[in-house]
């Protein structure tokens, strides 16, 4: 505006005669209609002048931020879209055509602005960012072009960017300064896009060896970090893609002792894949996949220098089958128990039986293993087997097991401390499972075997049982009570969650899902997820979709605890999907 005033003043000083006022008015009106620094069009024009480009990009970013603020962050607001429409193509062309000529600060600021537009017309620039990085990987944190390109494509999901983004991903090293600030954005974008064309290349990524660092050798540590990023992301994306061709690579990760840090993600991917993954695990359990078993043995020897003992691949196969949770896995697991001699493997198989919709045969098999184990028996990767199986007994959500559990407590062996700890744990499992008519048995067990801690928990459980009796919907409401979200009162909510699973039905499950936002305590959210799983034994795409809506909503929340608390919901969601195929 200052420039316009100066020019207008100069014109007036040159005007002569009585016609001056009228002529000046006409010319001034014309000048006001011209572009000036207060208008985005002025700066769009300046993009063509190399010496002005840096300042022009900064000013256009300011225009965009101001427009977005005035529109209350509404990207669809007319004033925001008007600015984008005026600038998106010139900015895109500048990045695409002048990439090599721009200084780093201007170039990165430009791609950030284009990414903020979330506009499909920026595709040539986003593609350029990915391709240039893949061609010549950068390491400086100042060269963060692909950070912004990844954020944009996370929402845009453009088919034409699938391969360029994949190639950039394959070149990104988290061990670099740039990798440290970009890896999360690239991971989230890869997961969001999950292009079907990636199944082959990402399965290949999982074939790369990983050697956990055992020294301070920076090169070895950096290589491990890079592989961890690539392979964890690859496993997660392969699960989302859902292509059965990924099952062999994911299963191979599960038996590779060098990839322990990738295995949790690979396991969830196998759960998503459902039946094809369960079929592969069954083959491994039966010892029929000799190539995979030989690979496992060679990796154990390579990393430890010793031959593996007791066929640990059996435990891995059982873990996969139990986590997937398909009822058709039960015959193979029960059959494996009949021939298995190793206590550790037997304990793992029994634990995994408790994760699958129960049958009389599976409950009997679980009890048989429990009764056969000595107090000193351990379960891989470590810990007392009976301790874990006592907790697992509760996963059946079967009050009919209470008399049997109390018999195990009475017959418990071992040294005094171990025996007392096991008996207290059994009493607590009994308390969780007890229906109103069984609370007297639970109280007797708690008084006999429990400490003051267990006795205090009994009081919480008793209160909620007295309130709700046999009414499943009452327990749903109790699970959602704000008082029970407090850690000191959470056992009342845990008891309520067990009773929802024991007394409820599909209607109860739907009521629970509808009120999950009220369940903020992580332990209660876990119990709620288990109740949903228990009440959906045949799986359900509809229920899975409802859980996914909750997970996606919380993932966008500024409260990171909300997203973290949804881990059990995710696993149940995948299990419900895996049971339907």
Annotated model-derived regions:
Residues 2-32:
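Sec-dependent bacterial lipoprotein signal peptides
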Residues 3-6, 13, 56, 510, ...:
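Positively charged, low-complexity intrinsically disordered regions
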Residues 11, 32-36, 47-49, 575-579:
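Extended amphipathic alpha-helical repeat scaffolds
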Residues 18-21, 25-26, 474, 495, ...:
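Low-complexity, intrinsically disordered short segments enriched for Gly/Pro and polybasic residues
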Residues 34-45, 66-98, 119-136, 158-173, ...:
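Amphipathic alpha-helical scaffolding segments comprising HEAT/armadillo-like alpha-solenoid repeats
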Residues 53-81, 100-120, 139-158, 176-196, ...:
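Structural detector for internal amphipathic alpha-helices that build alpha-solenoid repeat scaffolds
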């Amino acid at each position: 505006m200052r420039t316009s005033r100066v020019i207008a003043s100069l014109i007036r000083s040159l005007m002569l005669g009585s016609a001056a006022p009228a002529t000046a008015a006409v010319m001034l009106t014309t000048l006001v209609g011209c572009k000036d620094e207060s208008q985005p069009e002025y700066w769009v024009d300046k993009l063509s002048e190399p010496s002005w480009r840096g300042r022009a990009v900064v000013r256009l970013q300011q225009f965009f931020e101001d427009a977005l603020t005035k529109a209350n962050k509404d990207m669809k607001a007319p004033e925001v879209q008007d600015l984008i429409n005026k600038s998106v193509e010139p900015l895109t062309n500048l990045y695409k055509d002048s990439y090599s000529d721009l200084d780093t600060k201007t170039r990165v600021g430009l791609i950030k602005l284009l990414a903020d537009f979330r506009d499909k017309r920026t595709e040539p620039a986003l593609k350029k960012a990915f391709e240039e990085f893949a061609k010549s990987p950068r390491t400086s944190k100042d060269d963060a072009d692909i950070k912004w390109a990844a954020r944009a494509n996370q929402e845009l999901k453009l088919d034409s960017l699938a391969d360029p983004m994949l190639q950039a991903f394959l070149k990104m090293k988290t061990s670099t300064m740039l990798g440290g600030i970009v890896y999360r954005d690239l991971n989230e974008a890869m997961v969001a896009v999950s292009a079907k064309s990636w199944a082959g290349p990402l399965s290949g990524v999982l074939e790369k060896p990983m050697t956990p660092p055992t020294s301070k050798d920076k090169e070895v540590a950096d290589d491990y970090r890079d592989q961890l990023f690539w392979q964890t992301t690859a496993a997660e994306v392969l699960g989302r893609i859902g292509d059965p061709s990924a099952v062999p690579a994911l299963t191979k990760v599960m038996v590779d002792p060098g990839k322990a840090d990738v295995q949790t993600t690979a396991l969830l991917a196998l759960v998503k894949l459902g039946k094809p993954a369960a079929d592969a695990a069954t083959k491994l359990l039966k010892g029929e996949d000799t190539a995979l078993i030989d690979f496992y043995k060679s990796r154990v020897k390579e990393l430890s220098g010793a031959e593996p003992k007791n066929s640990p691949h059996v435990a891995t196969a059982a873990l996969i089958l139990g986590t997937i949770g398909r009822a058709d896995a039960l015959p193979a697991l029960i059959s494996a128990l009949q021939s298995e001699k190793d206590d550790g493997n037997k304990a793992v198989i029994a634990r995994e039986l408790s994760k699958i919709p129960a049958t009389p045969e599976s409950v009997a098999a679980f009890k048989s293993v429990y009764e056969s184990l000595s107090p000193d028996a351990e379960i891989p990767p470590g810990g007392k087997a009976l301790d874990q199986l006592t907790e697992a007994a509760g996963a059946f959500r079967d009050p009919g097991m209470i008399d049997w559990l109390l018999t195990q407590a009475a017959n418990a062996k071992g040294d005094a401390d171990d025996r007392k700890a096991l008996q207290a744990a059994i009493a607590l499992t009994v308390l969780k499972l007890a229906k109103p008519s069984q609370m007297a048995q639970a109280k007797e067990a708690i008084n006999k075997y429990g400490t003051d801690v267990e006795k205090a928990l009994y009081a919480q459980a008793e209160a909620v049982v007295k309130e709700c009796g046999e009414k499943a919907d009452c327990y749903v409401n109790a699970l959602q009570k704000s008082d029970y979200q407090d850690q000191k009162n959470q056992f009342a909510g845990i008891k309520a969650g067990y009773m929802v699973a024991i007394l409820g039905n599909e209607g109860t499950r739907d009521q629970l899902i509808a009120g999950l936002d009220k369940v903020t305590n992580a332990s209660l959210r876990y119990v709620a997820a288990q109740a949903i799983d228990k009440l959906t034994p045949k799986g359900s795409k509809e229920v899975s979709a409802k859980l996914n809506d909750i997970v996606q909503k919380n993932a966008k929340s500024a409260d990171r605890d909300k997203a973290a608390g949804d881990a059990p919901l995710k696993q149940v969601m995948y299990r419900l999907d895996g049971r339907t195929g």
